[in-house]
Amino acid sequence: MNTVLFALGAYLIGSISFAVVVSKCFRLADPRSYGSKNPGATNVLRSGNKKAAILTLLGDGAKGFLAVWLVKHFGPGYGVHENGVALVAIAVFLGHLWPVFFRFVGGKGVATALGVLLALNGWLGLATLVTWLVIAYAFRYSSLAALIAAIFAPFYYGLLFGPDVILLAVLAMSILLVYRHSKNIGNLLAGKESRLGSKKK
């Protein structure tokens, strides 16, 4: 029962869409109404407000980190261990993808997934982040960087810790993240994907 409560709390935390909240605070257009229509930091950046984009990125990453950090530090006292951590990791990620507070229309989960990985293990999160940065710098495609980082994340976890239930959670997040980028994959193949820094109206 405690595991379910932690997972439910994680889902609700994940359901807070910082792209929408931050945009409202800055009196910007709803990110679901322009560009890629994705409520995420990259699309908020297309508004031209870098501060709002950075706050969105930090907020989405922080909620993933917070949910996993809470269950890792307080879960054992309530009988919630590795299986619970894996469930919470998935729950907060699902909350971002399909948020109950925003009619189940959420983002693609890149920043939230990174927050989850950093909370699981700093080296795991750092390796995944470096992968994203290298690809983003080399090709200037945020989506391509996210896809490659997502593919490598389960391998990084496996190298660090071997096969366990949390690896399954990381793999599930990676698969969902790739799925959420289906349109981006099509655009990349067609040469129509927007590069970092461009303003797609």
UniProtKB/Swiss-Prot annotation:
Keywords: Cell inner membrane, Cell membrane, Lipid biosynthesis, Lipid metabolism, Membrane, Phospholipid biosynthesis, Phospholipid metabolism, Transferase, Transmembrane, Transmembrane helix. InterPro entries: G3P_acylTferase_PlsY. One of its GO terms (cellular component) is plasma membrane. The keyword Transferase applies. Its EC number is 2.3.1.275. It catalyses: an acyl phosphate + sn-glycerol 3-phosphate = a 1-acyl-sn-glycero-3-phosphate + phosphate. GO terms for molecular function: acyl-phosphate glycerol-3-phosphate acyltransferase activity. It is found in: Cell inner membrane. Probably interacts with PlsX. This is Glycerol-3-phosphate acyltransferase. The gene is plsY.
